[in-house]
Amino acid sequence: VTTCAGAKYLIEGALDFAFEREQFSRSISNFDMVKNKFANMVTKSWESDSINYMTTGAIDQAISKLDKNDDNFYAGVQKIIEDHSIESSIAKVLGSETLAYTVDEGVQVMGGAGFIEDYPMAGAYRDERINRIFEGTNEINRMIIGGYVLKKSILEEIPIRLCIQERVDNWIPDSDIELENKEYFNIVEFCRSLTLNITNKLILKYGQDLKNEQWLLEPFADLLISFSILDTCFKRFYSLNEGDHKSKTERVFKLTLANHYFNSLEKAQIILEYINDDDMIEKISIEKSKLNYKPNRIKYKQDIVNDLYNHKKYYLDIFTRYFLNHIIIVN
């Protein structure tokens, strides 16, 4: 949570400098490569923020149902926290890597001034690196993410086989969702089916030995992280009331959707190449072709930067209601 908050704060610091600094007789904020950096900062911060709110809110909601006078109250709290270990690890990895990206690109925007202690970026650049190491390195947290999903799937706490049976011939289930949100829903559900199938393939091939296959655990964890971002961010966007804030959020969500759709495909490809599953590679290609999905990520970034420049700071801290649930790969 603190790393995400730090990223939002540093966006404003880098933005203030970019507006003031001139090069070649114009503000560096007008250069497209600088705009690209800011669009990515905003999007990554919003994704991390969404995961944080979902995770902490779900834990808080579950704890609120416990009887504080019960002798087993604290044991119950511990059980709830353990039940959210996957979400917590995702939040830790995502938050620390979001801050790392924002600090690094913030220094790049500021140039040599980024190392001067008069600016907040210098201290952040010096201190940020530890976030990917303590509280469990991000590598250990990725092992937790993949390992816990594996464990829950084998114990059928996540009903992998049932869900796959329901999606054998149709990776995108029918829905009465509004037409304007149909494409978003379809992409999220495609990625859910993709993640379910990759999980199943790994369980069938390795079983519990998967925990020793770190070449696979890392891309598998990244696949799970990407799907968690897609699922949570769609629910956050969908829960918003119609209006100006939802329109601005939608512009960021479009970029999130495209980025993690392609990242999911890439991680799945890496896994399937390694385990030599050409049939699943072909199946993914067939199902993907049904989407006819043609995102325009540069246009999305241009829209995000326009909103950011108008606000002159991170501008997406508005919630209408909770969108709480476990991050799991089944409905």
Spell out what each predicted region is:
Residues 1-331:
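Alpha-helical interface subdomain recognition
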